[in-house]
Amino acid sequence: DKYRGSRELIKSRLRVYLPFVEPLKHLDPDAKALDLGCGRGEWLELTKELGLNAHGIDLDDGMLLACKELDLSVETGDAISYLEKLADESQTVVSAFHVVEHITFEQLQLLVSEAIRVLKPGGLLIMETPNPENIVVATRNFYLDPTHQRPIPPELLSFLPEFYGFSRIKIIRLQESKDLINRADLTLQDVLSGASPDYAVVAQKGAVEDVMSQLDTAFKNEYGLSLENLTGRYQSQISARIEQAEMK
């Protein structure tokens, strides 16, 4: 819990995805959710509470013990190998929370290409990872975990689902300080460390309009703080101060 956060904290953060997932449950009473690298099962618990048939896979038996204590459906194994064995159009949601930064780019490509194969029309792929737009994350915090491979820019991670044929993609920036969103007076430290420390790519497989329209609001909303937002506001603030000084 020291570095990851308590179970309840993680569950509260994961609720940001519910507006994407809840409509799919209403459209498909037999909706299945697969969580790759499920860890302690916070997302499995949430999707199970929604009424989805949730299943998780992870290599860490210690993590899976927490899932089994909650009677969550899990198994030990390699996530991508498991994904490759699934039938076409058999899943409603495929998720990978803080997985993609641990695998090679070739494995990431395979994950995305297999996800679109196994998802039903209208199904979702969710991939969450540290956000290198946050300079402190990109240059320091990311490397506190020696199993991390390399930071993945949002533009790259969002391109992959587009390349493999997903119909629409949304970047969701996460876990930023809410105080920074409307703060008028930014510091340099705010710029360096204030961009959302995590982000996710949510990608939807194409389907008929009646299905796609159910998620329109979730896909249209804006989420979090980008580095560009903070640098633009900071520059405007500096320019205004220079202008005021020149007028004196």
Task: Kindly label every feature range from the protein language model.
Residues 93-99:
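A short beta-strand submotif of the Rossmann-like class I SAM-dependent methyltransferase core
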Residues 129-148:
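Short, glycine-/aromatic-enriched active-site segment of Class I SAM-dependent methyltransferases
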Residues 122-129:
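Conserved beta-strand signature within the Rossmann-like core of class I S-adenosyl-L-methionine
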Residues 109-121:
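A short glycine-rich, Lys/Arg-flanked "PGG" loop and its adjoining helix->strand segment in the class I
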Residues 101-103:
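A short His-aromatic
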Residues 166-178:
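Conserved S-adenosyl-L-methionine
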Residues 1-89, 93, 109-112, 176, ...:
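Conserved N-terminal segment of class I S-adenosyl-L-methionine
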